[in-house]
Amino acid sequence: MVTSPLRAFPADGYTVRWQRWHHDGDETLNLRWENEGWTATGEVGHEAVTYVIRLSATWQVRQFLLFRDLDEPDLWLGTDGSGRWGELNGAHRPDIDGCVDIHLGCTPFTTTLPIRRLKLEEGDSVALTVAHIDVETLGVTPVDHVYVRTANRRWRHIDESGATTDFDVDEYGLVRDVPERFRRH
């Protein structure tokens, strides 16, 4: 079955908000087009963090910045687009080489990255190794995730422990609700 394509984001940007499932925090995400790519800025209230993800026009991660309690980023990672990662100071991060996407557990937005980038058809799946970022410790580790497009706007995510989550996306590929975790508002 041919799947309908995702809608292009408005050129002047897009804002979406999620709330924690049990109303104990929220997130505001702003997407804007600049310098021939997308910049996603998320403010996650329940974690007291702000993240910035700079993406290519084809939704490949180029840079990731995480701010907690400083004006300067607590963590700043960059990739060459071929799976080689490093830090702002130029230090190579071979421990996460090969990862194309990143995963932050405090936001549903990072789930959108492979959805937008891969353009899977209904019934297709892909196994990816992603760079998982722990916002408390600033640890970055490679973890395996599987994404399955089960219907036009329905997906299944299987994490490294085998836990399965089904969720719906909107016309842009942004997660609507993740049961027991996040809901759009």
Give the role of each language-model region.
Residues 2-26, 74-155:
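Solvent-exposed helix/loop surface patches that form functional interfaces
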Residues 8-53:
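N-terminal ordered "arm"
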Residues 25-29, 49-53, 72-76, 163-166, ...:
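A structural detector for short beta-strand units
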Residues 33-38, 54-61, 79-82, 150-153, ...:
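Short, solvent-exposed coil/turn segments at beta-strand boundaries
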Residues 44-46, 157-161:
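Short loop/turn motifs at secondary-structure junctions and domain boundaries
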Residues 44-89:
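Hydrophobic/aromatic-rich structural module bridging two neighboring secondary-structure elements via a short loop
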Residues 159-185:
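C-terminal structured interaction module
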